[in-house]
Amino acid sequence: MRREGGFIGSQPPWDGANRPGNWSVLDVYNRQRQSLWIRSSDPFVNNVVCDLRFEGLNNGTVFVDSGPLLLPVSRVGTSGVITSTTRSKYESASGLFPDSNGYLSVTHPNLALGAGNFTIEMWLFVATSRSNNGILSLGTSDSIFTVILSAVSNFLRVAGSSNIASVPLNSWFHLAYVREGTGTNQAKLYLNGTLINQATNASNYNQTFYSIGVYFSSGFCWGANMDNFRVTKAVRYLTNFNPETDTYMS
């Protein structure tokens, strides 16, 4: 840091798409004042491209991305996602999604996963069986959604695999979809830290929009609770893990 207060180091690479140049003292002050300064022991914090923690008042309609990109979060649909204090995995609230016509959307050039490695994860709470309900799709509208995670006939699905495992009911569960390469069986789904499916996924995901809580159509939304949705452009888990201690979410 220059003693005269001009610059603080070089700007982290994940913020390059937002602001060129170095960080000033005012940049740091404003982040701290807005509680946006990231203090984390997470070794992958600079690889995070989306981090929704769903904190807010009951029936709240404001959603904040806590990741380095500070993405604007949009509510899409006529029903609308809300924050609910009725149940939460961490802190005081979670996101409550309607069964239809209500999901969240974020967009940024850095959201494109390409053919690289990634970890998509979240905590979910489901009170009743899921029929055709979306967890994450890429794209901006019904006609171009690419479904990544969903629940169909109460079975979990990921891109390229179906009917993997039943959706747990009436308890929080952690779901992590990890692509550690594009070779055979390098795309893995973990339920509560235990590997339940592995397949091949060599898709090039160039979409810069995430539609969270929706299936192939806005008529099929998540319809349940979600907490701590996070996407990381890195492999967080190579083997079974403990989601209570190994995720850096709590």
Positions of predicted regions on the chain:
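Bulky hydrophobic/aromatic "packing anchor" residues in well-ordered structure
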Residues: D65, G95, L136, S211-I212
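A general structural signal for stabilizing positions within well-ordered secondary structure
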Residues: D42-P43, S166, F220-G223
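Flexible glycan-contacting loops in extracellular carbohydrate-active proteins
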Residues: I196-N225
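Extended recognition patches within non-cytosolic domains
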Residues: G5, Q11-C50, L57-L69, T184-K188, ...
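Extracellular glycan-recognition modules
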Residues: N46-V49, N58-S66, S100-F155, G181-Q186, ...
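Extracellular glycan-interaction surfaces
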Residues: P68-N101, I120-R130, D142-S203
